[in-house]
UniProtKB/Swiss-Prot annotation:
<dbReference type="InterPro" id="IPR000594">
    <property type="entry name" value="ThiF_NAD_FAD-bd"/>
</dbReference>
<feature type="modified residue" description="Phosphothreonine">
    <location>
        <position position="800"/>
    </location>
</feature>
<feature type="modified residue" description="Phosphoserine">
    <location>
        <position position="46"/>
    </location>
</feature>
<feature type="active site" description="Glycyl thioester intermediate">
    <location>
        <position position="632"/>
    </location>
</feature>
<keyword id="KW-0677">Repeat</keyword>
<feature type="modified residue" description="Phosphoserine">
    <location>
        <position position="21"/>
    </location>
</feature>
<protein>
    <recommendedName>
        <fullName>Ubiquitin-like modifier-activating enzyme 1</fullName>
        <ecNumber>6.2.1.45</ecNumber>
    </recommendedName>
</protein>
<dbReference type="InterPro" id="IPR032420">
    <property type="entry name" value="E1_4HB"/>
</dbReference>
<feature type="modified residue" description="N-acetylserine">
    <location>
        <position position="2"/>
    </location>
</feature>
<dbReference type="Pfam" id="PF00899">
    <property type="entry name" value="ThiF"/>
</dbReference>
<dbReference type="GO" id="GO:0016567">
    <property type="term" value="P:protein ubiquitination"/>
</dbReference>
<feature type="modified residue" description="Phosphoserine">
    <location>
        <position position="13"/>
    </location>
</feature>
<feature type="binding site">
    <location>
        <position position="528"/>
    </location>
    <ligand>
        <name>ATP</name>
    </ligand>
</feature>
<dbReference type="InterPro" id="IPR042449">
    <property type="entry name" value="Ub-E1_IAD_1"/>
</dbReference>
<dbReference type="InterPro" id="IPR035985">
    <property type="entry name" value="Ubiquitin-activating_enz"/>
</dbReference>
<feature type="modified residue" description="Phosphoserine">
    <location>
        <position position="4"/>
    </location>
</feature>
<dbReference type="GO" id="GO:0005737">
    <property type="term" value="C:cytoplasm"/>
</dbReference>
Amino acid sequence: MSSSPLSKKRRVSGPDPKPGSNCSSAQSVLSEVSSVPTNGMAKNGSEADIDESLYSRQLYVLGHEAMKMLQTSSVLVSGLRGLGVEIAKNIILGGVKAVTLHDQGTTQWADLSSQFYLREEDIGKNRAEVSQPRLAELNSYVPVTAYTGPLVEDFLSGFQVVVLTNSPLEEQLRVGEFCHSRGIKLVVADTRGLFGQLFCDFGEEMVLTDSNGEQPLSAMVSMVTKDNPGVVTCLDEARHGFETGDFVSFSEVQGMVQLNGCQPIEIKVLGPYTFSICDTSNFSDYIRGGIVSQVKVPKKISFKSLPASLAEPDFVMTDFAKYSRPAQLHIGFQALHQFCAQHNRPPRPRNEEDATELVTLAQAVNARSPPAVQQDNVDEDLIRKLAYVAAGDLAPINAFIGGLAAQEVMKACSGKFMPIMQWLYFDALECLPEDKEALTEDKCLPRQNRYDGQVAVFGSDLQEKLGKQKYFLVGAGAIGCELLKNFAMIGLGCGEGGEVVVTDMDTIEKSNLNRQFLFRPWDVTKLKSDTAAAAVRQMNPYIQVTSHQNRVGPDTERIYDDDFFQNLDGVANALDNVDARMYMDRRCVYYRKPLLESGTLGTKGNVQVVIPFLTESYSSSQDPPEKSIPICTLKNFPNAIEHTLQWARDEFEGLFKQPAENVNQYLTDSKFVERTLRLAGTQPLEVLEAVQRSLVLQRPQTWGDCVTWACHHWHTQYCNNIRQLLHNFPPDQLTSSGAPFWSGPKRCPHPLTFDVNNTLHLDYVMAAANLFAQTYGLTGSQDRAAVASLLQSVQVPEFTPKSGVKIHVSDQELQSANASVDDSRLEELKATLPSPDKLPGFKMYPIDFEKDDDSNFHMDFIVAASNLRAENYDISPADRHKSKLIAGKIIPAIATTTAAVVGLVCLELYKVVQGHQQLDSYKNGFLNLALPFFGFSEPLAAPRHQYYNQEWTLWDRFEVQGLQPNGEEMTLKQFLDYFKTEHKLEITMLSQGVSMLYSFFMPAAKLKERLDQPMTEIVSRVSKRKLGRHVRALVLELCCNDESGEDVEVPYVRYTIR
């Protein structure tokens, strides 16, 4: 991932870590920053416990320490128009100590274009007072108050962070000077039509604890030289990922023990597997082993005050294609403030007189600017466009700038992530009509309605067009909620004939409330789509939104059929998995509909726009597959907590889900055994043995039996299996080359001894016994003392390691072994399984893993099982929070990123609705608010292919009418002849989905039978599925040869049958 120059780490180093060591360290920095009050935050604030069930996903972004800092920070948000309410919403969801809303203005029609907590009946009322109760509902932990007085110094002194939005420059300078002198953090945010501005001043001594938010890296050491400087070589399994200037610490190094536990050492990267540290020439010889871990060292950064930075600005780039624009807009915004101060209003939309005056003012500002700011020439065209749109107020721009500003507030409170240093300018001029003559002053005049702020930028024609749009929103989670809010604000589907259809089959959970801002605590367990639809109707009563609860996929194509898609103007994805995204992408390509795609991961986000006949599709490029953990690593040779957590998840499935499912199938499906025996490798043996254990060998009758089973299973996994492994591979075992077997990624384990007084051991038994009981419909117990008492009487069989037990060292060995099956053992199992007739009414209860319910023992089992195995292998354990992240495959999320990303999505929506045809009008985007980094690029054009002289892309296809003029359907022979005659293509293979309909190597008898059959009849017979009445056309894939016999790539066929 590329990053901006401003994301480069500021490097610091210090004196020796301890007497006699040659390694420089971060010790001086640690002591230096510890003397500075942490970011000036109030230390006497309430240290309330963090509600992990509410802040779960955000905690994985910020961490507990940063979250505690947020909870001690009071924030003032001044200005409650669209931008101010967006910032307030995000920081209230984030969980700061308290928020005060300040505004002395009253609600106007133009405010309703983007201020989602103002309604038509609020016109004439104070914006802060009206917004306060609606914002207060977002988070019961955050007191929200309204203030309508002046921003006097005594009032400002009560806050740790002050946010000014849509504030005059004179007020910004006055408040900025005061805040800088008092150590109060300041964020200034402003939006003007399609332009946005952000400024940060977090004082002269801000302590930054983590500049990027990434998990500290670690690597296994294979060699350290005795040299000045010493060179560390890591195992070549994976690149170490460190950067020059990073600090690292060492552990488990054998031989060169001076490295173990030393203070963090600054490194210089030499290559992907090597880096230098310090003078190691006087250290002991390196023997083997060791883990090197990155250490996040706090650092101090300094900000200039607003007046000083105004004269000598530093910019964060938002678009490298507009490299000179920030400096121009720095002048332009100062000129705009001057214009507003002189006229008590912004320039009138599309008014040439006002635009000319703003250009003149900008030239005067430039002329008197200091050398650091002064430009050779003022970009008159840019300043004119600023004048044309400055009266506008757009929800998507406010969402983007508001998301960024709220993240900066969180940085100011916590010291987590690199702040914006110090100015950021943004514009989305590509949203304006491609026809530069399309907009006039008359078209942009206010209409005294809720869209005036948007009409000022785009005119009334686009507003009418937006109202008529029919859009399909797939998902009503975090991105879905933000999209619905923006749709309501911009008027999408709010006019005659317009509609937004939203589908989501999920219900609301408490952990959703932290970022899915349309939901409230009293909505928990309700359907997301219904609740979100009702919430946005409050924001704009004119939005015509229909809510569904359907999963998108082949099963719902009778609902989302040809008629449904053909009536749509576009689709917006708000999905959380790649499979569903790719499915929707295929549907959009087939129906030739625009697709707005986006996603977030913590502080990272991306936006992709897919335009028919213009861009590639979402599926045209794919991320590389996630690296999987080798099975033998999981089974026998774990070396990281991720390995033990995955092992624990597999244990959960293999103990509490799969056996119960297999037993139920065995008891109800007479062909289960026959089908199981056809499985590959050792699977038949494993499945039938599990069924035998569940029904015969380990079937419990009482709660006490479940406790006994859990205790026995504990001994099997954490003692007996480890002893067997060490019997096969003793600690001093050597490989065939004479190297130690237990070295590098292989950590030598040790067996554990069960101790009922060990909390972790009892945790395991409690969770395992309760889950085991649940699978049999038995009642469990949460009485730890009673379980401990039961364990005293459990007899554990003596275990002796066996000779001849094969333990596979590599996955290749395992695959070879899987090829052979013990047929006699299978026959024995079939004979000993009880007949289903002898177990009438018996069934088991499979357990689906649910990570977010802390009372169901699921995570209790995972944490205990993983940490016990980690103890076996001397791997550092993981707490419940980290375990839930890894085992539950949780996607970290925070409201700020979602707001910013959806703002960008809706800027693309403006272009789609206008029908922009130039590729460079559209922008795919990537951002990382932690760095901060912003990257925009033109979408890639759809790749072009050719057969003969015919060019085609993924948007093209052959259209074949299946019904002939005589009313009969085309046969396979007629279909093949049609392509030979019409397109000079010889079809060599023809398929529909996974069904092969025709191939050149098909047996002659089968071919003869099919040639005269109608196409749909062949499809139904081969797929063994009857075509539904909703199916009007089939997608057929072809392999073809041209007239010279060469294989050619051709588009798919849309074969119409109705």
